[in-house]
C-alpha cells in the first residue's frame, strides 16, 4: 500500500516505513505529524476524492536538516554590477508510521 501526500506545495509518494525529505515542518524531532493524502493505492484499489476523508497518513519527525548549497549570480551587462549569492533550503526528514 502506498499514498500520494501533499505538503509544502509538493506531492510525495510514500509507503509505510519510508524516510522522506520535505519542506520544513514546525515541530520537535520525535513528534507526530498528520499528512494530507491526495491518493491512496492498495493493490488494485485506488481511493481518491471524498473517500479520502477516512484515510490518515501519519509520520514522525526524525530530524531537521538543510539541503545542498545552490549558488547563483546576478550580472548586469556594461555596468560592472555582479552579485553572487547562495541558498540552502531547510528540510525536515519524516518517517511514515502508518497509512490507515
From Swiss-Prot:
Supply one GO BP term. translation
Q: What keywords were assigned to this record?
A: Ribonucleoprotein, Ribosomal protein, RNA-binding, rRNA-binding
- PANTHER family in the record: 50S RIBOSOMAL PROTEIN L21 (PTHR21349), LARGE RIBOSOMAL SUBUNIT PROTEIN BL21M (PTHR21349:SF0)
- Per the record's keyword annotation, is Zinc-finger included, yes or no? no
Subunit info?
A: Part of the 50S ribosomal subunit. Contacts protein L20.
Q: What is this protein called?
A: Large ribosomal subunit protein bL21
Query: Which GO terms of the cellular component aspect does the record hold?
Result: cytoplasm; ribonucleoprotein complex; ribosome
